[in-house]
């Protein structure tokens, strides 16, 4: 729902997941689901935030929220900081050649400034009072920007400043799950997960973009606990694109649904969600471990990926193009012997697959094969 977030809509989304998805295989192995408020939650009162968290808990969900600790979106230098009224925003900006550092429409703030620590303390206290257990920290790169100087004179580089600020975040938010977005890869010890592809939506180009990040960043789930490939949107796309988008999520790490599931949200999006977000065989793959590209030596997004999971091997092939394509499963490249007999099933269609024959993938679609 992007910038249309309201308190009633948030409750409706929680209820939609409870009534339509959680009882139909869209949940973690412990039966939990995370419901996150994104940008816009600050229009809620504290009582509404607490009520939202309580609704999530009643629905068997864990509530999440959003914050951008190292940015000033207002860019009003003379404004007073709400959580540190002895300072104005001009006091906390990072300056380069005497000018505020600006990126993506926001000014970067100094992670070492005491006013920023005061904001962290008060924001974490608010989130904790309300009961939030998950925080998406966005636009983190602002905290790593270079500057003429920092409040703390011992800091000499942007990454030093970022590391200082992240240590403070860990101090105040260390009992919550932290998901980083638009952030440096390192230092990595302050968060559980990191988004490796941002603003991915509903089309096959979004799948290709996501898989480009996985092609060359699959290993980052060895650094963080999970890779996050951003949300999956289903409305206004073909069903093949829906399958491809969902597959791109389950083989990356975090599996996030992004349509508007409030009562006024897209009917098509809800129908597609109940159809495609509830495939038990597909959803069981989403255990937070990234697939690896089979080749990984090109300059574009790879389209074939695999993961060995005990005695089960998963093989995925995407078709990013408009026309159908045929592919022979590269048995040797995925560690299989041509002479061995294997059972193979395509998980979206449920069809049995003969691995000795070419597989046809329609345009803007995917084949997700389980081999046992």
How would you describe each model-predicted region?
Residues 243, 249-252, 257, 295-336, ...:
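Carbohydrate-binding surface patches
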Residues 30-95, 166-175, 180:
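Acidic/aromatic-lined carbohydrate-recognition and catalytic surfaces
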Residues 353-372:
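C-terminal beta-strand-rich structural cap/linker in extracellular carbohydrate-active enzymes
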Residues 332-350:
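Solvent-exposed beta-hairpin/edge-strand motifs
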Residues 8-39, 130-131:
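Catalytic domains of carbohydrate-active enzymes, especially glycoside hydrolases
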Residues 1-9, 34-46, 102-118, 141, ...:
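The substrate-binding groove and active-site-proximal loops of carbohydrate-active enzymes
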Residues 20-25, 111-139:
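An active-site-proximal structural segment forming one wall of the substrate-binding cleft
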Residues 80-114, 118, 164-267:
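Glycan-recognition surfaces
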């Amino acid at each position: 729902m992007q910038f249309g977030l309201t308190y009633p809509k948030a409750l409706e989304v929680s209820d939609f997941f409870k009534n339509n998805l959680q009882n139909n295989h869209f949940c973690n192995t412990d039966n939990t689901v995370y419901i996150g408020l994104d940008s816009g939650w600050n229009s809620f009162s504290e009582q509404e935030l607490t009520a939202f968290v309580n609704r999530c808990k009643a629905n068997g969900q864990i509530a999440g929220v959003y914050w951008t600790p190292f940015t000033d979106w207002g860019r009003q230098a003379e404004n007073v900081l709400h959580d540190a009224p002895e300072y104005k925003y001009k006091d906390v900006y990072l300056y380069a050649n005497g000018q505020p550092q600006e990126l993506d429409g926001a000014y970067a703030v100094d992670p070492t400034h005491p006013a920023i620590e005061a904001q962290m303390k008060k924001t974490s206290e608010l989130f904790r009072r309300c009961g939030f257990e998950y925080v998406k920290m966005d636009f983190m790169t602002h905290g790593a920007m270079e500057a003429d100087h920092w409040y703390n004179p011992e800091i000499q580089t942007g990454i030093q400043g970022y590391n200082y600020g992240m240590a403070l975040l860990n101090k105040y938010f260390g009992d919550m799950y932290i998901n980083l977005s638009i952030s440096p890869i390192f230092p990595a010890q302050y968060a559980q997960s990191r988004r490796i592809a941002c603003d991915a939506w509903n089309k096959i180009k979004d799948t290709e973009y996501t898989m480009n990040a996985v092609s060359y960043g699959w290993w980052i789930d060895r650094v963080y606990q999970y890779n996050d490939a951003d949300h999956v949107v289903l409305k206004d796309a073909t069903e093949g694109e829906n399958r491809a988008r969902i597959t791109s999520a389950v083989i990356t790490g975090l599996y996030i649904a992004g349509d508007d599931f409030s009562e006024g949200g897209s009917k098509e999006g809800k129908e597609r969600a109940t159809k495609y977000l509830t495939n038990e065989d597909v959803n069981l793959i989403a255990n937070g471990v990234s697939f690896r590209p089979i080749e990984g030596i090109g300059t574009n997004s790879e389209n074939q990926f695999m993961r060995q999971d005990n005695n089960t091997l998963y093989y995925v092939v995407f078709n990013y193009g408009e026309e159908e394509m045929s592919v022979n499963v590269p048995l040797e490249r995925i560690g299989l012997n041509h002479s061995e007999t294997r059972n193979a099933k395509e998980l979206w269609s449920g069809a049995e697959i003969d691995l000795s024959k070419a597989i046809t993938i329609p345009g803007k679609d995917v084949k997700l094969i389980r081999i046992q």
